[in-house]
C-alpha cells in the first residue's frame, strides 16, 4: 500500500468515527430534550394541581370574605326529606360560605332501629349522600341529632366523606382564636307549665316529669331522676370538650361556638307549646347547657336545632346568642356572619331565611 493510501484509509476511518460520535451525540441530545420536556410537563402539572388545590382550600376554608370575617350556612332537621334538600340547595347554590353547620337529624329512625347494626349501615349511606350534596356548597361540620344510628355518636364514628367532619363530642379550630365545639343528641323532654321567656327559673321546673326519652342521653334506670342524671351526663360531655379546648389554646386568647342539637333548657328557641293545652309548654333542652352558657366567658354562641317550630334568636343571657335556624323539612334555614372587631369575634349579621 502506498503511503498516501495509508493516510487516505486513516482519514476515512476517522470520518466514520466522527459520524458515529455525531450520531451518538444527536441521540443523547434528543434524549436530553425529551427528559427536559417531561420534567417541564411534570412541573407544570404539579403547579396546576397545587394551584387548584389552593383555590379549593381557599373556597372551603377561607371562604368568600376577608380574613376577619366568616360566613356560615345554618341548617338542621332534614329527616330524610329529599325534596326539601333539593329546594334548599337550589336556593343557596350561588352563595359562598366558609362552612355549613349542620345541627342534627339528617335521617328519621325509630328508637328500635337506632341501635341496630343492620340499620346503621343503611342510614350511614343516606347521611353520606346528603353530605356529598351539601359539599357542593361548602364543607360541613355536623353533629347527630336524636334520630341518627348509634355509630355516629361513637368516639370512632365512621368517616362518611373526605371533606366534612362529625364533631360530636369533639372540637375543631377554624381560626387561631376560634374553636367550634360539637355535641349532638338530646336529653329527655320535660312536661312543664306556663312559660315565661324572660325568666330562667332553675328551681321551679319539675325535673321528674319526663314525657319522652332522650337519645343517647337517657338513663331511665334512675326513674324520676332520669332527666337530672341524663342532663348531668350531657353537661359533663360539654365540660370535657371545653377543657380540651383550653389545653389546646394554652395561654392564648380564644372564643368558642357550640353546635348542639338541643339547646339550653329555658331558651324560647328550645321550648314548644303543647297543642290543645293553652299555655302548657314542653321543655326540650338542657339545664346544664344553660348554666355553662351563663358561666363560660369564652362561649359566645350556641347554635341548635331539634325544635322545629321555635326558630329564632335569643340574647337573654348577656353577651351570649342562642340561635335556632329552624328545620329544613319546614323550609327554614339561617345565615350567620361573624366579624372580628377589636380582636373579638362578634355576630355581624344573623338572618333567618326560608325557601
Residue ranges and their predicted role:
Residues 72-82, 107-122, 190-205:
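Acidic/histidine-rich helix-loop elements
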Residues 82-175, 283:
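Core catalytic region of metal-dependent phosphoesterases/phosphodiesterases
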Residues 107, 113-124, 250-298:
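Active-site-proximal segments of metal-dependent phosphoesterases and phosphodiesterases across multiple
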Residues 2-74, 78-86, 93-95, 136, ...:
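Acidic, histidine-bearing metal-coordination/catalytic regions of metal-dependent phosphoesterases
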Residues 179-280:
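Active-site-proximal loop/helix segment associated with metal-binding centers of metalloenzymes
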Residues 171-176, 287-296, 308-355:
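Binuclear metal-dependent phosphoesterase catalytic core
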Residues 62-73, 171-182, 253-257, 314-322, ...:
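Beta-strand-turn-beta hairpins that frame and shape the catalytic cleft
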Residues 74-77, 100-105, 139-146, 166-169, ...:
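Active-site neighborhood of phospho(di)ester-bond hydrolases with catalytic His/Asp-centered motifs
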Amino acid at each position: 500500500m502506498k503511503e498516501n493510501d495509508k493516510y487516505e484509509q486513516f482519514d476515512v476511518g476517522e470520518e466514520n468515527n466522527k459520524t458515529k460520535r455525531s450520531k451518538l451525540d444527536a441521540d443523547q441530545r434528543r434524549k436530553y430534550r425529551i427528559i427536559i420536556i417531561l420534567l417541564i410537563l411534570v412541573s407544570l402539572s404539579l403547579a396546576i394541581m397545587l394551584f387548584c388545590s389552593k383555590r379549593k382550600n381557599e373556597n372551603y376554608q377561607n371562604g368568600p370574605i376577608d380574613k376577619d370575617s366568616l360566613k356560615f350556612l345554618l341548617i338542621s332537621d332534614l329527616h330524610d326529606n329529599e325534596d326539601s334538600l333539593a329546594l334548599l340547595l337550589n336556593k343557596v347554590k350561588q352563595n359562598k360560605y366558609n362552612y355549613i353547620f349542620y345541627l342534627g337529624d339528617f335521617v328519621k329512625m325509630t328508637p328500635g332501629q337506632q341501635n341496630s347494626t343492620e340499620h346503621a349501615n343503611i342510614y350511614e349511606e343516606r347521611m353520606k349522600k346528603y353530605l356529598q350534596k351539601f359539599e357542593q356548597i361548602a364543607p360541613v361540620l355536623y353533629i347527630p341529632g336524636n334520630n341518627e344510628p348509634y355509630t355516629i355518636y361513637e368516639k370512632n364514628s365512621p368517616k362518611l366523606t373526605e371533606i366534612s367532619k362529625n364533631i360530636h363530642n369533639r372540637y375543631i379550630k377554624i381560626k387561631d382564636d376560634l374553636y367550634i365545639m360539637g355535641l349532638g343528641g338530646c336529653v329527655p323532654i320535660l312536661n312543664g307549665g306556663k312559660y315565661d321567656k324572660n325568666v330562667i327559673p332553675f328551681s321551679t321546673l319539675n325535673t321528674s316529669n319526663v314525657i319522652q326519652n332522650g337519645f343517647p342521653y337517657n338513663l331511665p334506670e334512675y326513674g324520676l331522676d332520669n332527666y337530672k342524671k341524663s342532663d348531668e351526663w350531657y353537661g359533663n360531655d360539654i365540660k370535657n370538650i371545653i377543657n380540651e379546648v383550653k389545653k389546646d389554646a394554652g395561654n392564648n386568647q380564644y372564643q368558642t361556638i357550640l353546635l348542639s342539637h338541643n339547646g339550653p333548657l329555658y331558651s324560647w328557641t328550645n321550648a314548644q307549646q303543647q297543642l290543645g293545652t293553652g299555655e302548657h309548654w314542653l321543655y326540650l333542652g338542657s339545664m346544664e347547657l344553660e348554666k355553662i352558657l351563663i358561666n363560660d366567658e369564652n362561649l359566645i354562641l350556641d347554635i341548635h336545632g331539634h325544635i322545629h317550630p321555635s326558630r329564632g334568636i335569643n340574647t337573654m343571657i348577656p353577651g351570649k346568642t342562642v340561635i335556632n335556624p329552624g328545620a329544613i323539612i319546614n323550609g327554614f334555614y339561617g345565615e350567620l356572619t361573624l366579624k372580628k372587631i377589636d380582636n373579638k369575634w362578634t355576630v355581624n349579621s344573623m338572618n333567618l331565611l326560608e325557601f
